[in-house]
UniProtKB/Swiss-Prot annotation:
This is Capsid vertex component 2. Residues 1-49 are annotated as: Interaction with major capsid protein/MCP. Residues 125-138 have a biased composition (Low complexity). Residues 112-123 have a biased composition (Basic and acidic residues). Belongs to the herpesviridae CVC2 protein family. HAMAP family: HSV_CVC2.
Amino acid sequence: MDPYYPFDALDVWEHRRFIVADSRSFITPEFPRDFWMLPVFNIPRETAAERAAVLQAQRTAAAAALENAALQAAELPVDIERRIRPIEQQVHHIADALEALETAAAAAEEADAARDAEARGEGAADGAAPSPTAGPAAAEMEVQIVRNDPPLRYDTNLPVDLLHMVYAGRGAAGSSGVVFGTWYRTIQERTIADFPLTTRSADFRDGRMSKTFMTALVLSLQSCGRLYVGQRHYSAFECAVLCLYLLYRTTHESSPDRDRAPVAFGDLLARLPRYLARLAAVIGDESGRPQYRYRDDKLPKAQFAAAGGRYEHGALATHVVIATLVRHGVLPAAPGDVPRDTSTRVNPDDVAHRDDVNRAAAAFLARGHNLFLWEDQTLLRATANTITALAVLRRLLANGNVYADRLDNRLQLGMLIPGAVPAEAIARGASGLDSGAIKSGDNNLEALCVNYVLPLYQADPTVELTQLFPGLAALCLDAQAGRPLASTRRVVDMSSGARQAALVRLTALELINRTRTNTTPVGEIINAHDALGIQYEQGPGLLAQQARIGLASNTKRFATFNVGSDYDLLYFLCLGFIPQYLSVA
């Protein structure tokens, strides 16, 4: 018997072990006999009511799916626009970058044409009269900054063309004997220290003021008020002039010149000083101290343009210029302030949404495009900044005396242009105590608008205020440095231009791109420009809130820009610099 098998009767031994198969060898629990009778294996047949319920559930699910699909389809245009807008912005960035490169190429060509500028100066010395066949295009390139000076004719950019003449006039000494003030010297030294690559494209040897650097700096000053993101049919300067005229028209209905109302945009530019005076009077009549600031907590931190064309609600309404324009009906109510379904008692005939600026643009500019500033709040923000800067410009030029002693002027056109000062002209006017008796009012600004602003606008209708007055842009960028400290302690400022980091960066990028085969990415240039634009935006507000901003009360500050008289101030505002020659012997 094999001890491993309990069924010994089935064990057969024939020289091998062999176990016979038997049912008793299969050990398993007893299978339930009624297992296949359970209900789960015997489903009753579906009734008609149950089939109807299933069909109804299917129809309900299909209707819900169609409704969800309709909602998603309604959101598709918004989603598509949200995805396409960054692509459009990149395309605009590329177009603006190409335009900037074309401008840089034009500036480089002008730098190569310095000998031609010197030859033109020699031709003027020979007394060559202008050709009588000169057309209107040549007349548009002539401007007059000071009334007792002859007009200036330029090629493409007045400050850049004059810079070439300044360095060419120094002769053999080159840039070693040309200075512009400590402010420019500080910016140049900061640029060299922070961006050493700029030394490849500019000549900074022996501490000289580089002509290439000054050209790039002036172009940066001119660009800080421009909008490079987006495509617009109207400039911020045009919008500012239209708003000022509408405010004057609304608040000064008994004006003596109502019978001879302006018929063209040039008439508005000629009367710009009286519009600015009216703005100052309207703001002065308001109670409290005016606030020239936006809601910083509702604005993008490092971006000037508004995403989708609009900032957060209430971001711009705190600025006194915008509040004044809305209060007097020049601008309609801000989006969301007066809903469309408001009672007719609150908003009769939908007056709160009428936009007179759009109508004025059609009347004076007639470009076939609507102008609704609340729909493009980036342009509205730039417009308010332009109006504030114009108000500052009026205060800077108020009661200026350009007939004072000529030897007090740092800028002498006679050292650049032979015969610039006629021999019969009076070399000395009222100065010292006598100059205080002169009250010129807005005469200098009126002459500047007619003889300088209007020709430049006619030559380029897209021009912005900072392109017209780069010196004003420099003052606005330097406004924070000129703020008085609350403490009475005497502090010596050794910051070496740290406040102008944005200007230094943009100028350095302009210089570096001249020697690079792979230029700086467009996004980096836009970021640098936005940082400079945001800093410039704060300047007009700070200057507008100061009681005294003129030359008489800020001589030390203006001395850093090489400005020593009202005559210098006029040229500085228009050129962005005042050159002075030094002996290098």
